[in-house]
Structures are given as structure tokens and as C-alpha cells.
Swiss-Prot record:
It is found in: Membrane; Golgi apparatus; Mitochondrion. Keywords: Golgi apparatus, Membrane, Mitochondrion, Transmembrane, Transmembrane helix. GO terms for cellular component: Golgi apparatus; membrane; mitochondrion. Its main location: membrane. The keyword Transmembrane applies. General regulator of phagocytosis. Required to uptake Gram negative bacterium by macrophages. Coiled coil: none annotated. It is a single-pass membrane protein. This is Protein C1orf43 homolog.
């Protein structure tokens, strides 16, 4: 009986040593990883700094140009004029499955509209996304260069734009035609 208890205690000692060394290795790996992570965060990046061993003027020019990259915004044309999906849209009788095409056409219609953005020193491409929404809100809330513009027209255009861009409901041919009509009416005002 005594030899059996010695055997169990020996197995226990080996298991405790194995588990202890496993915990030690895992802690070592974790601590090393955290130290490397914080060391990488403290520098400019995980690699050699930009412009390493370059003259000071060149480093400053590189930093200026890299900071400009964050300000670049580009929204591509969603549907080309010769897109095959537009041909399907015109030939198909069931229009409900092509709602996304009307959304894309509505967002592309801003670029091709005749709204005189240039009178305020803006360009149609600079009025994409949130800027176009804020432009419409400015038209609605302040005195505008468009003297005869009704607030209901701007509200219709704003609702159509938000539905086309962010809405989850149906945006079909009827909604697109309403939006296009409001956009052309604003352009002629």
C-alpha cells in the first residue's frame, strides 16, 4: 500500500511540473508579445520610419504629402452609360428585383444634374455623400441663391436622396422618377 501511494505522489509531482512549465511558457509568450506590441505602437509604425536617412526637407515633404492622402475622397460613377444592367432594366417586366439599379442611377444623377454648384465655388464632385446632404439642408434652412425654390421641393429631394443612399425600403422606378423630377426642377430654378 505504501508503494502505491509513492507512485501516485510521483505522478502528481511530474504533472505539477509539466503544468507549471506550460504556464511559464505561455506567460513568457504573452508577455513578449505585449512588449513587442507596445514597442511597435510607440514608434511611427512597425517598420523603418518614412524617409529614414533622408534630408530634413524631403522628410517634411513626404509627411505633408502623406497627410494629404487622408483628405482624398472619391466616389466613382456607379453605372456607366453602356452598362448591360441598364438594358436588362429597360427590357424586363418585373422591376422589383432591380431596385438597386434605380438607387445607383439616383446617386449618379447628381453629377449629371444642371444644378449651378459653380455659383458658390463648389464642384458637383465635391458635393457627394454627406456634403450633398448638408448642401441640401443649407438650401432649405438659409437664404439661397435659388430665389424661387420651395422648401417642399428640397424636402422631396432630400428624402429621395436619403432613401436612395441609405434606405432599406423599396426604391423603384416611381421613386426614381420623383427624385429625378425634383432634381431637374431644382436645376432649373
Amino acid at each position: 500500500m505504501a508503494s502505491g501511494s509513492n507512485w501516485l505522489s510521483g505522478v502528481n509531482v511530474v504533472l505539477v511540473m509539466a503544468y507549471g512549465s506550460l504556464v511559464f511558457v505561455l506567460l513568457f509568450i504573452f508577455v513578449k508579445r505585449q512588449i513587442m506590441r507596445f514597442a511597435m505602437k510607440s514608434r511611427r509604425g512597425p517598420h523603418v520610419p518614412v524617409g529614414h536617412n533622408a534630408p530634413k526637407d524631403l522628410k517634411e515633404e513626404i509627411d505633408i504629402r502623406l497627410s494629404r492622402v487622408q483628405d482624398i475622397k472619391y466616389e466613382p460613377q456607379l453605372l456607366a452609360d453602356d452598362d448591360a444592367r441598364l438594358l436588362q432594366l429597360e427590357t424586363q417586366g418585373n422591376q422589383s428585383c432591380y431596385n438597386y439599379l434605380y438607387r445607383m442611377k439616383a446617386l449618379d444623377a447628381i453629377r449629371t444634374s444642371e444644378i449651378p454648384f459653380h455659383s458658390e465655388g463648389r464642384h458637383p464632385r465635391s458635393l457627394m455623400g454627406k456634403n450633398f446632404r448638408s448642401y441640401l439642408l443649407d438650401l432649405r434652412n438659409t437664404s439661397t441663391p435659388f430665389k424661387g425654390v420651395r422648401k417642399a421641393l428640397i424636402d422631396t429631394l432630400l428624402d429621395g436622396y436619403e432613401t436612395a443612399r441609405y434606405g432599406t425600403g423599396v426604391f423603384g422606378q416611381n421613386e426614381y422618377l420623383r427624385y429625378q423630377e425634383a432634381l431637374s426642377e431644382l436645376a432649373t430654378a
